[in-house]
Structure formats: structure tokens, C-alpha cells
Amino acid sequence: MATATASRLAVPAPRTSPQAPGRRRPAAPLPSAPPRPRALSAAPRGRVVCPAAPASSPASTTDAGQDRLQKVPVSNIRNFSIIAHIDHGKSTLADKLLELTGTVQKREMKQQFLDNMDLERERGITIKLQAARMRYIMNDEPYCLNLIDTPGHVDFSYEVSRSLAACEGALLVVDASQGVEAQTLANVYLALENDLEIIPVLNKIDLPGAEPDRVAQEIEEIIGMDCSNAIRCSAKEGIGITEILDAIVTKIPPPQNTAISPLRALIFDSYYDPYRGVIVYFRVVDGSIKKGDKICFMASGKEYVADEIGVLSPNQMQVSELYAGEVGYLSASIRSVADARVGDTITHSSKRAECALPGYSQATPMVFCGLFPIDADQFEELREALEKLQLNDAALKAVTRFSMQFEPESSSAMGFGFRCGFLGLLHMEIVQERLEREYNLNLIITAPSVVYHVNLADGETVECSNPSLLPEPGKRRSIEEPYVKIDMLTPKEYIGPIMELGQERRGEFKEMNFITENRASVVYELPLAEMVGDFFDQLKSRSKGYASMEYSLIGYRESNLVKLDIQINGDPVEALSTIVHRDKAYSVGRALTQKLKELIPRQMFRVPIQACIGAKVIASEALSAIRKDVLSKCYGGDISRKKKLLKKQAEGKKRMKAIGRVDVPQEAFMAVLKLEKEVL
């Protein structure tokens, strides 16, 4: 390499004495150029194919791309996911696998390569699952490895479940310095439900605080998995990556060879392309599919022609055919988002499969809120944006009775909008930011609420997620709210503050177990409404960031709930109404009225701001009127003249108060809605 470097450098001419006039120095013969050396890359033990290298040279990590498209036997296909708690190095490990197998050139490599959205890079989290096809050589045998990267946050566990349904194995990545976290357990249970082969991986062993032996013991004690042969690696430093690839090949079983059966392919993801229509990601379970085949989506019954099929490596690369066990994408000029749903089965129109694949259980939305455009003219744009966004956000599709049917929600304060359901607060924030960034919308989002069961006096039970639609007290018998079981893992020194938090949120203590000498699992059952606010932030704050949580819905229970209305100048503001527990109604009402008093501009008349439960006012503030000095023109004279002017002013203010309307500015709405999220 030094020779090649030297040959490119400018060599200064040797210093000589001045030439005598009239004499010409004979030209020196040009030196012959040294032979150009062949660039060699440091491939780990020659395991990855380099199609450009001669047969006698060792294999290289460089991949020209076409090798990944070559067919391999079904017995040499491995479909796997990477599952982990958030921030345990899952995306970094995926990057190293792509780099080592030559799927992505080193000069093109960047952090979180599979995370395509700006939001994912800014927040350092994975939101959408991504797929990538890799080629790996072991014992001179080529293998096709299909990686499906998954999110780690609890709000996106539905994305994880869809990924696992398309795989036969999973890498369970655990941070060697932090140990087993709450979402680690949840992901393991998902993998076991799908009957996957799980390979434990201890990541970040290069950190000074890493304790791989302790963490391996934790996994054995908590999960019950043998970790004697757990792979110890550092995705950042590239340590142990080859051992992981070997384990994928040797431990994860291949898919079943059902290529001669009728086509059945499971759709596990999709997105909308403005030029090509709906792009479908699928896993071929039975049979095969070719470019130009006439296909049918079994749930919708719609038929299309497969204009383009290919693999994700990780960019889209066209192929002519995909067989059973392979993962790829499909484009068929699909313009209707309803025709290609996640979980649907693709089959041939001429030779249809007898039954569809099981698909996925629908995600249950946990949090509801209203989305309103600040500019009323953007209402139709918001409708179109939600239609496109719901295609590749499977959780949004589960909301069939609310906004995803696009039934408009109207508010006297904020105009027309939609009511949407989300899996959690982070999911809600991500959807809002995607709508604003990708579709250039300016939105107001109302305070989050949950779905309540209202038992009416006539014996009927109705669901209500919008406080403004809650039946009147005389028509309802009781209200039931959803409860969740929450499992918090925390170091033992923070058990006290964690239990205080559970008690403050109307939680019921269930059990506490020491999973290791220094870490405990604290289990509470509490209302979902108490958790959708700042519960997670408080959990991190009280544990100095060391605690984690995982929750699941356990059912509905009757509670003493009331509807809290906010009235401004006697008029209720529907957008600020909320459902709260009676014990918290006063504190919430007081906080909202004080905040509104700070934000609403003063008027020419006195404006009362009241928090009410039915007809009863429980908290009140008032904006004093702007006073005009009507006596300024009276320099003297009879007192009756002054009294007449003051009386006339008082009558005018009384009339203005009776017919006047107070406009709440958008800034006040946004500030109060943010406050509601904090105090509820």
C-alpha cells in the first residue's frame, strides 16, 4: 500500500547546479511505473464472498450486489429478527451485520443505516421495522440471511410481533452493563409465542461497567434460558460479529420447503409511494411468485398484476422470482390503501390457496385524542395524509370506529378534525410529527384520553373516548375505566420512590420480587388514564433513569369518575373538557383555570373562568376588565355629570358581557392542552 501511496505523490526534482549557457542537458530516461497493487480488505477469516476477486484470492467483505440475488436452496435460508429493550444496541448490531456481510459498502455506511426516517435518527430509536437481505459464506456454502430489524419501545411492540411472525429465529440482545430490562422480558414472551429459536447476545462488553457474567446469570434466573454459550460482543467495536453470523446459520432452522404448493405470502409491512402506489413487503410461506403473475389479496378479493418484485438488500433490488421462505417486496400499481392490508395473504388468481394465513391479531389502541388543523382549509389535506399514513402504520388501522373511518369531529373552538387512537404517548407524538413534517400540516392535538365503558340507566353499555360525548349524569348509572398491569424493574435503592409513584396514581400494589440481589420487580395495577400522562417521565426521574417498565391491559373496573368542564364567560369550551377521578377534580380544575387566566388577553368586561362538574363550580378565576377613564374630560362641574358617565359605562359593560364573545388564542389552547397532559 505504501508503494501505491508513493506513486501518487509529486516527487520534487533533485537540486542541481545551474546549466551553462548554450549547452543542453540530455533528457533523463523516465522511470518505469511500478505495478499497481491490488487492494485487499481485511475480511474476517474469508467468510464473505467477493464476486470481483479471483478464485485464488481470499474472500472479501466487498459485495458487488448481484451475489445477494443468486438463488440458494431453501435449507440455506435463515429468517431472523433482532429484539431488545430500547437503547441496547440493536440498530448498531444491524449496521455491523450489514457491513461485515458486504451488504453495505463501508464508504456508504452510516449509523442507524436501516432507520430511514429523520425522526428515528433524531431520537435515536427505531420506529418502523425494516428488512435486509444478506449473503454469508460458511464452510464454502452460501447462505441467504433475511434480517428484519424491529423497534424496542413498548409503544411499538405491535411492530415487533409482526416481524417475529415472518421469522424462524431471533437474536435477543441485552446490554452487558444494564442487564435485563422490562421490554426484554416482553420481547422474549413474544418470541416464545411464535415458537422461535432464541440466540442470547450480550452486547456492549467494551464498556467499563460491563458485567457479562452477571447479566448472563440474570437471563438464566429471570427468563430461564441457558446462557452458558451466550455470544459476547461489542457491536460498536465489531467484536464477536462473526460468531453471531455463525450462530444464525447453525442454530436457527430454515423455513419449510413448500415451493410446489399454491402461493401464500404474508404481508408484514407496506408503505405508499406517490409514483408507484402501494409497495408491499411480504414473506413467501408457500409456493412462488414471478414478475407478471396475476395475484389476489385474499382479504379484500382485489386482483392485480405484479409489475415488479424484488428483495430488500437493504435497498430495493429487482428479481424475476421469489420462492417459499424468501422475503421481498411487490409493486402492482395499487392505488387504494384498503386493498393491501398488513396481515393479508397474497395468492395467485388462477390457482388460489384454500385458506389464508392466520395473519396478525389487531393492535388495541390505548390512547385517543383529537387532531385538528390550525388552518381550516387543511382539513381535506389532513384526511388524505391520514389515509396514506395509516397504510404503513398498522396500529392506526386498528381504529375502525373512530378517525380511521374518517368520521369528522367538530369543535366550536377548533373547527373540524379527526379523533385518532394510538398505542401510547410516544406513538401519538411520532404520528403528529410525521403528519407535520411529511405532509406540511400545522396541527393542534387535544389532551389524550382513554376509552371508557359507560353503563346507562336502561342497561345498555356504550364506549366513550371523547369527554364531550359523555352521557349526562341522569342517563348513566356508572363509568368503568381500563386498568393495566405494570411491571417496573428498578435497582433496590429506588424501590421507595417507585412505590410512592404507584400510590399517587391510584395504583394497587400486587407484588414485589427481587430478581437479583440488587434489582427488584415491582408490580402494580393502576388506571390506564393515570399512565398516559407523565408517568414514564416520573418513573425515570425518581429512579435517576435506571428503572424501566412494561404494561399490559387487564380489563375494566368501575371508578368514581366525573366530567370536568371549563367555562369561559359562561360558555363551555368542549376542547378543554376532560374526564377525571373525583378526588383529583379540584386540583386539575384549579391548575387549568389559573393557566387560562395567564394566557387569555383581557377584555373590556370582566371574564369569569370556571371549572365545573355539572352545574357545580369547583374552581374559579376572573380576568379583570380593561378600564377606560370616562371622567378624563370632566375637569370640574357637578358630581351628577360624573355619575351619569359612570352609569352609562357600567350599562355598556353589562350589555357587552351579555353579548360579547371571548376568543381563546391558539397559543392558550396549546399551552393548556400541554398542561392537561401533565396534571391528568
Curated annotation (Swiss-Prot):
Residues 28-37 have a biased composition (Pro residues). Residues 1-51 form a transit peptide. It catalyses: GTP + H2O = GDP + phosphate + H(+). The keyword Oxidoreductase does not apply. Residues 1-68 are annotated as: Disordered. SMART domains: EFG_C. Keywords: Chloroplast, GTP-binding, Hydrolase, Nucleotide-binding, Plastid, Protein biosynthesis, Transit peptide. One of its GO terms (molecular function) is ribosome binding. GTP binds at residues 84-91, 149-153, 203-206. GO terms for biological process: positive regulation of translation; translation. One of its GO terms (cellular component) is chloroplast. Belongs to the TRAFAC class translation factor GTPase superfamily. Classic translation factor GTPase family. LepA subfamily. This is Translation factor GUF1 homolog, chloroplastic. It comes from Oryza sativa subsp. japonica (Rice).
